[in-house]
């Protein structure tokens, strides 16, 4: 997305840790300090359904009685299947933040952000069914955004609330050095 600084700070690379390594770390904190809740702040933790499912299955296999949350606003399009949502819930996931950013297709093009509304509504329904709370994040004030765009965003906020999203987070765009939008 044009407002994100991550591509600049990571040299356009995303490096994943293996499912085993991720769960090893969770198990370490659980056993060493009795930490039972983990907030995942990965740039895009669900980028691979296979990897997400492997992490969930490993948590289940080890019988780790933990809770975990995806707090960083993941791209809903990266969660490909309802099976992934089911495994996430079984492994202790209780919260997923998604990032529609705007209800305006014009603004979405301006910020280079895809969002599949129908897929989001379907997954929100599944998340509700399995006990995962959901948050939808929106960003206001993008350069080129007009009143009509904000009205479309407001409509999407209400539509997602009706679809069952648990909470809405509103942010003001901040042009951070290193992001496209700053330039």
Regions found by a protein language model. Give the residues of each.
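Conserved beta-strand->loop/alpha-helix structural units within folded catalytic cores of enzymes
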Residues: 132-138, 160-162
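Mixed-charge, polar/low-complexity N-terminal
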Residues: 3, 157, 161-162, 167
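Flexible glycine/acidic-rich beta-alpha junction loops that bind and position SAM and/or redox cofactors
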Residues: 49-50, 106, 110-111, 140-148, ...
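C-terminal, active-site-flanking charged/polar segments
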Residues: 119, 156-159, 173-178
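Catalytic cores of alpha/beta
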Residues: 84, 144-161
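Radical SAM [4Fe-4S] cluster-binding motif and immediate context
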Residues: 1-134, 155
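Short glycine- and Lys/Arg-enriched binding-loop motifs that mark or flank ligand-binding interfaces
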Residues: 95, 137, 174
């Amino acid at each position: 997305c044009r407002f994100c600084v991550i591509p600049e700070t990571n040299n356009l690379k995303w490096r994943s840790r293996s499912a085993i390594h991720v769960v090893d770390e969770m198990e370490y904190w659980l056993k060493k300090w009795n930490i039972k809740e983990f907030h995942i702040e990965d740039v895009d933790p669900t980028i691979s359904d296979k990897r997400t499912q492997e992490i969930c299955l490993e948590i289940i296999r080890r019988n780790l009685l933990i809770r975990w949350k995806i707090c960083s606003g993941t791209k809903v399009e990266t969660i490909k299947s309802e099976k992934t949502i089911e495994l996430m819930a079984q492994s202790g996931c209780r919260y997923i933040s998604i990032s529609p950013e705007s209800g305006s297709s014009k603004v979405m093009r301006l910020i280079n952000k895809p969002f599949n509304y129908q897929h989001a509504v379907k997954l929100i329904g599944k998340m509700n069914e399995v006990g995962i709370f959901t948050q939808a994040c929106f960003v206001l004030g993008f350069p080129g955004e007009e009143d009509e765009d904000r009205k479309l965003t407001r409509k999407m906020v209400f539509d997602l609330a009706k679809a069952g999203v648990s909470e809405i987070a509103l942010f003001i765009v901040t042009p951070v050095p290193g992001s496209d939008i700053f330039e």
